[in-house]
Amino acid sequence: MENIRINTEFIKLDALLKFAGLCETGGEAKELIQGGAVKVNGEVCTMRGKKCRAGDTVELEGQTVQVAEGA
């Protein structure tokens, strides 16, 4: 599992997918999220604006990343 460090209180799910390199564009992120391909903390999430905070895990196509605090 890869840690993705953020310097803010949260990052929106679609932005996290791009930032983590799990998808290339915002449009691709939107399609994946709305299609039910993304899990947040083990549950399918279809809200692209979902606020992901430190400690949350996001899974897409067998790849898992965890949001971590700070630089």
Go through each PLM region and give its residues:
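A basic, amphipathic helix-loop patch mediating RNA/tRNA/ribosome contacts
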Residues: 9-54
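A detector for short, charged/polar N-terminal pre-domain segments
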Residues: 1-11
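Intrinsically disordered, low-complexity regions of eukaryotic proteins
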Residues: 4, 16, 30, 58-61
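Generic structural motif recognizing short loop/turn segments at the entrances and edges of beta-strands
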Residues: 2, 36, 61-63
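C-terminal structural segments of small proteins and small subunits
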Residues: 44-71
